[in-house]
A protein has these predicted regions:
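C-terminal alpha-helix plus adjacent terminal tail
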Residues: 1, 29, 45, 58, ...
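Glycine- (often His-adjacent) and acidic-residue-rich active-site loop
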Residues: 10, 40-85
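Hydrophobic alpha-helical membrane-association signature
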Residues: 18-21, 79-82, 226
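Catalytic-core regions built around general acid/base machinery
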Residues: 25-28, 82-94
């Protein structure tokens, strides 16, 4: 299954209605979906938040962010919650999520790429977390996966400076799984998807939550998670072989 951002004329700039739609898609995935690709049309994955959202009155059909911010911190906090779900939901879904990223992935675009489990990037990719340079912070569920990928110090440096990270550096610091020429991005992503689909589905479905648990579990807790997961898998294999 592929979810594609399709506003290339605006460099796939994002608005809140898109975030709500992303959440709906993640929540509604069919049981038989094993891999999801997050992709984008055009020369850029996403240039981030549409700056029109930061103008007085906002954009037609979208919530007025400045009006909510002026009302109270609590009003803005409540407004942001459902928007974050468009990103955080992809970290929780059962399928493996792969982002195919070309060109700009800035701010919200960077955070959408971080919502994926794996990132394949084109050699023209430019990651940047620009929120701090605008007087804000990254707030679309991107801070945890960023720190997981590159560590606290590097995450602080990237967010505080807002500098651009290219393909080779992204691979070197753990932001990207691999980098390929832009013309090979789709084919390489398809090859990765086929490799993932070639694994036994029950094992792949058990692996993702197991590794996520390892991020916060103690070693004693994690070995329990491992043996419980393995017990279920081996029991299923035995039953499939006609044993009881």
């Amino acid at each position: 299954m592929t979810v594609t951002l399709c506003n290339p004329d605006q460099l796939n700039a994002q608005v809140p209605s898109m975030w709500l739609a992303l959440a709906d898609i993640a929540h509604g995935l069919a049981e038989d979906v094993r891999v999801v690709v997050l992709a984008a049309e055009g020369r850029s994955f996403s240039a981030g938040l549409n700056r029109g959202m930061l103008r007085p009155g906002g954009m037609p059909g979208e919530p007025d962010l400045l009006a909510a911010a002026a009302q109270s911190p609590e009003a803005m906090t409540a407004l942001i919650g459902p928007f974050q779900e468009g990103f955080a939901a992809w970290r929780r879904v059962a399928p493996v999520v792969v982002a195919a990223v070309q060109g700009h992935a800035i701010g919200a675009g960077f955070q959408l790429a971080l919502a994926a489990d794996l990132r394949v990037v084109a050699d023209d990719v430019k990651f940047a977390m620009r929120e701090v340079s605008l007087g804000m912070i990254p707030d679309l569920a991107g801070t945890r996966p960023l720190v997981e990928a590159v560590g606290y110090s590097r995450a602080l440096e990237l967010c505080a400076t807002g500098r651009f990270v290219g393909a080779d550096e992204a691979v070197g610091m753990g932001l990207a799984t691999l980098a390929v020429p832009v013309g090979e991005l789709a084919a390489t992503t398809a090859d990765l998807v086929q490799a993932l689909l070639g694994t036994p589905p029950t094992a792949l479905r058990a692996l993702k939550p197991l590794l996520n648990q390892a991020l916060t579990a103690t070693i004693d807790e994690q070995v329990v998670h491992e043996r419980v997961a393995q017990g279920h898998l081996l029991h299923g294999m035995a039953r499939a072989a006609g044993l009881s």
